[in-house]
């Protein structure tokens, strides 16, 4: 898989059914982490594969769905276009610098939730800027 493809599959895995804005916002979080971690020479693949950072990667069933996702799937095609634009630096950050996101209705009570300010809300996801 190319870096564009990996990023697209994780974007789809995290934001399936959330539309283009939801996919862009998830992609923004990933790219914000790449920027934050640039001193460690991290790229998008390093960020998404980091242990327990993205639930779709850590869930075996979800990961299998992501890996078997058809390249003809309309949401995959949309996620791939978003991925390419994000990697080229051609998309604005609609999350205002968020480095985390969660669904407040279903997320476990993470210790960082109260510490990181919410910067953006979209449908079922809240986006927050970490340290």
Give a label for each model feature.
Residues 1-131:
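Bacterial extracytoplasmic/cell-wall-associated proteins, especially those involved in peptidoglycan
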């Amino acid at each position: 898989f190319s870096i564009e493809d990996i990023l697209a599959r994780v974007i789809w895995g995290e934001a399936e059914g959330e539309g283009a804005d939801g996919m862009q916002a998830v992609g923004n979080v990933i790219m914000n982490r790449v920027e934050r971690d640039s001193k460690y020479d991290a790229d998008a693949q390093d960020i998404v594969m980091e242990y327990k950072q993205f639930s779709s990667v850590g869930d075996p069933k979800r990961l299998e769905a992501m890996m078997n996702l058809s390249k003809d799937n309309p949401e995959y095609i949309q996620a791939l276009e978003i991925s390419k634009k994000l990697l080229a630096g051609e998309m604005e950050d609609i999350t205002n610098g968020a480095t985390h996101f969660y669904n407040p209705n279903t997320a476990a009570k993470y210790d960082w939730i109260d510490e990181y300010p919410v910067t953006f809300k979209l449908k079922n996801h809240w986006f927050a800027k970490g340290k």
